Structures are given as C-alpha cells and as structure tokens.
C-alpha cells in the first residue's frame, strides 16, 4: 500500500493500533450503561474512533463524533452478540449477518480529505411485538433527540414519508408477522455523516405496506411522492426510463432516503436493485437510457469507472462491457431468512436517483457489490488503493488499510470477503469520480465471537 502522506496529522493510535486516544479517554470517563450498550460501544465505538483518526479528523471533531455514537447509536443496537446466545428476536436486514450497523468512508479527491459516516437500524426493546411490530419506536425517539442535537435539522420530509410509506394498523401488522412466522423486517435506518465543519442526518425508508409483497409497487411510491411534490421533472424522467427502457424495466425500488435539512437544500434518493453487473447495463442506467447527454468529460468518467471495477475485481484490461462480473463465493454468507422473499437483493448492483424538486434530470450513483465479486477484503483494499494512488488520491490509502485490519481483528483480511460490502461511484461536474467504500463490522461473525476474551473489563482495547 502507499504511504500515508498525512504530514500535518499526528495520529493517536494506541500501542498495537487497536484504539485511539480519544476513544480511550471517553471509555475511561463515560459511565457504564449495561452490558449490551457497553459491548456495542466497545465494538463499534472503537471502530469509529479508528476510522476518524485514519481520516485525520481534528481531535475536537473526533470527540464530537464519538459522543454522537455514545448517546445516539450504542444504546439503540439491541442485544449484543455473544457466543452461545440465542438469536436476537429482531434480526436486522441492514447487513447479511444481522449486524444493525454500517460504516462508510467517502474517499478524498486530490488535495482533499475523506469523510466518515455510520448508519444503523435502531432496535427497541419491544421490536417485533404487538406494541412495536415494525420496530419504529426507537427510531422515532432518536429522531426526536437528534433534531435538537444536530444543528440545522429539519424532519419535514421524514414526517411525510413516515405517514405515507407505511400503514398504521399495528394489529394487522402483528397478524401478518404471525402468518409469516417471522418479524416484518427492517424498515427504518438513519445515518450521521461527519464532515469537518458540520454533521448531516439522513433517514432511510424501506416501505412495509400491509398488502406489499417483496417490493412496493411504483404506483404506491408515486402516490407518496405526489403528496409531497405533485410535479417533478427528474421524477418524470425516472418513470419514463423505468417504463420504456429494457434495463429500466428490470429495476426494483426498495428504499428511499432524505436529508433531514432545509427542503430547499435536501435530496430525495430513490434506491433500486438491478440484477446486472455488466458495464453496459451500468452505463445504460447511469445515462438514464441516453437522457443524460454524453460529453467528453462523462465519456472519460465512464472509462475511469470501468477501469476501476476491472482493477478491484482483478479482471483483464479487455474484459467485455457485456459480461457480468464473475461471482466469487468468498464471504461465507448465505441467504438469511429475512431475505427469503427477496433473494435478488443479494446480487446485482444498486443505484439511487436523486429526484428532489428543482432538478430536470436526477443525479445517479451506482453501488457495486465488492462482497460478491472480489477475491477477499485485502485484495479489494490493495487494488483500490493502487488505483487511487495512480490518480493522485492515495494519501489516505495506507491509513484506511490499517483501520480495516483493526476492525477485522478476529481474522486476516486475506482470509475472506464480506467486511467490505459496496463501492459506490457518482460522477462529479469537475470530472472526478466521487467514491465511497461501505463496510459491515460483522458483529455476528463466528470468528469475532470466539475471539472475545473470556473476561475483560470495560474500556479494554478489544471487544
């Protein structure tokens, strides 16, 4: 891997590289809140600390981010995984192994800095019961608290979609879950994105209508959108693509996210799953079937994206645009019960279309599932860093690699895949590729559970 190159930032990793000074200070001074909360804090709190340090956040911002986690993440992750424990009553669908937490690392452009984000599905004590069949109570509590804690927060759009993407007869949801023999499944997620001078709050909605099968149908989505904004040129363009284009007809809508800020500045991201990973399909979707004009800059961006995907998957230079990227069964994951009615969600690429009012055409991002198509986590990391370094963006590559090794302290990165889940790309107006790596802490990985020490005191470096 490339050298760090961060001459202005003195990193604060403790001896052995398993935590940072900020995390150790907070862990020693903040009060215990019970075994489950403490366990999640020791796991994901330490991971967050290492990522913030690797991304060279100022020390005061590191403390701020960790305190957000302490107050608004760790207490809401449900029962902590333990070796030999019964499976949790509510199993999150945020990750394949049931971990209700996700990290992302937005890669720096030349001369810039990375951004770190976390997302989670809050799990309340009554999740899946007749009192809270959709597991919404914890999320509503957190949003109420964060609306005061995050400057500039505005929940207007979140309130609208909470009211229109779900039914409100909890008794019928309880009956449906009993008929299914399992809980309804994940429907609300939130994320905090930590920029250097601000923090952004987003809400994600996975609709769960009573008459819904695997995916909510397009007319039901549109009914919700129309209640917010009757006319939207970007949304009209997406609908035309979905109904007339061969690739568009294959897309399945499964999620929506909104920025919880002033509606004048917020985005509405509509997420779809595609069964394809071939680059011709990626190009067709990211141009909206030719509706987004081809330019010299965009042509170069597509060439760069294809080169990047061939690099991380270790495919040869003349790999055809029409070929699906080969599937690599290396992560040990299988279809968990909550995905039984939507197995397509575990393969193919994911896209979002930003359909916020004021745009004639949507901004589009593709999420490539590296967990399915790359040899192992070390290969993904090394190949991505090599690509970034060759384009003057490798300043943080080595620090990112070391952070991943710390997070995966229960195994070696070269042993398997699955820690890194997606690599996303959005084309920027300046010609750069906006890239983000997403990863799963794998809290329920058998190796992590057996790796735990038999006894430990709160605040130790390792969970």
From Swiss-Prot:
InterPro entries: Aro_prenylTrfase (IPR033964), Aro_prenylTrfase_DMATS (IPR017795), DMATS-type_fun (IPR012148). Signal peptide: none annotated. GO terms for molecular function: prenyltransferase activity. Pathway: Secondary metabolite biosynthesis. It is an enzyme of class 2 (transferase). The keyword Transferase applies. Mn(2+) and Co(2+) strongly enhance prenylation activity. Disruption phenotype: Impairs the production of the xanthones variecoxanthone A, emericellin, shamixanthone and epishamixanthone; and accumulates several upstream metabolites, including emodin, chrysophanol and monodictyphenone. GO terms for biological process: alkaloid metabolic process. Its EC number is 2.5.1.-. Keywords: Transferase. NCBIfam families: arom_pren_DMATS (TIGR03429). Belongs to the tryptophan dimethylallyltransferase family. Dehydrogenase involved in the conversion of monodictyphenone to the prenyl xanthones such as emericellin, shamixanthone and epishamixanthone. Monodictyphenone is first converted to variecoxanthone A via a paeciloxanthone intermediate by the consecutive actions of the FAD-dependent monooxygenase mdpD and the xanthone prenyltransferase xptB. Variecoxanthone A is further prenylated to emericellin by xptA before being reduced to shamixanthone and epishamixanthone by the dehydrogenase xptC. This is Xanthone prenyltransferase B. It comes from Emericella nidulans (strain FGSC A4 / ATCC 38163 / CBS 112.46 / NRRL 194 / M139) (Aspergillus nidulans). The lineage of its organism: Eukaryota, Fungi, Dikarya, Ascomycota, Pezizomycotina.
């Amino acid at each position: 891997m490339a050298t760090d190159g961060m001459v202005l930032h003195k990193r604060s990793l403790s001896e052995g590289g398993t935590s940072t000074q900020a995390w150790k200070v907070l862990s020693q001074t903040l009060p215990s809140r019970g075994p489950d909360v403490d366990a999640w804090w020791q796991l994901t709190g330490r991971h967050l600390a290492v990522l913030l340090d690797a991304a060279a956040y100022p020390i005061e911002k590191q403390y701020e981010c960790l305190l957000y986690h302490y107050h608004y993440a760790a207490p809401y992750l449900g029962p902590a995984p333990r070796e030999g424990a019964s499976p949790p009553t509510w199993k999150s669908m945020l990750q394949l192994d049931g971990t209700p937490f996700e990290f992302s690392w937005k890669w720096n452009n030349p001369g810039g800095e990375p951004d770190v984000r976390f997302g989670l599905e809050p799990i309340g004590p009554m999740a899946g019961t007749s009192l809270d069949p959709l597991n919404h109570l914890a999320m509503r509590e957190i949003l109420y608290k964060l609306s005061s804690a995050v400057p500039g927060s505005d929940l207007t759009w979140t309130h609208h979609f909470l009211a229109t993407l779900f039914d409100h007869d909890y008794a019928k949801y309880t009956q449906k879950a009993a008929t299914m023999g399992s809980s309804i499944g994940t429907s609300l997620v939130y994320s905090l994105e930590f920029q250097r001078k601000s923090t952004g709050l987003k809400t994600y909605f996975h609709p769960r209508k009573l008459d819904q099968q695997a995916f909510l149908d397009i007319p039901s989505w549109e009914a919700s959108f129309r209640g917010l904004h009757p006319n939207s040129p970007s949304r009209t363009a997406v609908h035309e693509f979905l109904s007339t284009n061969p690739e568009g007809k294959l897309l399945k809508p499964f999620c929506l996210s909104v920025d919880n800020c002033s509606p004048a500045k917020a985005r509405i991201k509509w997420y779809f799953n595609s069964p394809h990973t071939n680059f011709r399909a990626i190009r067709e979707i990211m141009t909206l079937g030719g509706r987004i004009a081809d330019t010299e800059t965009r042509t170069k961006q597509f060439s760069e994206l294809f080169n990047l995907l061939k690099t991380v998957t270790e495919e040869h230079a003349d790999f055809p645009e029409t070929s699906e990227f080969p599937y690599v069964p290396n992560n040990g994951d299988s279809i968990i019960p909550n995905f039984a009615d939507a197995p397509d969600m575990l393969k193919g690429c994911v896209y979002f279309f930003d359909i916020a009012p004021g745009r004639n055409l949507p901004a589009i991002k593709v999420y490539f599932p590296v967990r399915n198509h790359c040899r192992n986590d070390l290969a993904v990391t090394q190949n991505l860093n090599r690509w970034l370094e060759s384009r003057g963006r490798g300043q943080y590559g080595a620090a990112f690699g070391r952070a991943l090794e710390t997070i995966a302290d229960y195994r070696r990165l070269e042993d398997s895949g699955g820690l890194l889940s997606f690599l996303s790309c959005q084309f920027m107006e300046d010609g750069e590729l906006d890239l983000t790596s997403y990863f799963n802490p794998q809290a329920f990985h058998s190796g992590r559970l057996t790796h735990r020490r038999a006894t430990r005191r709160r605040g130790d470096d390792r969970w």
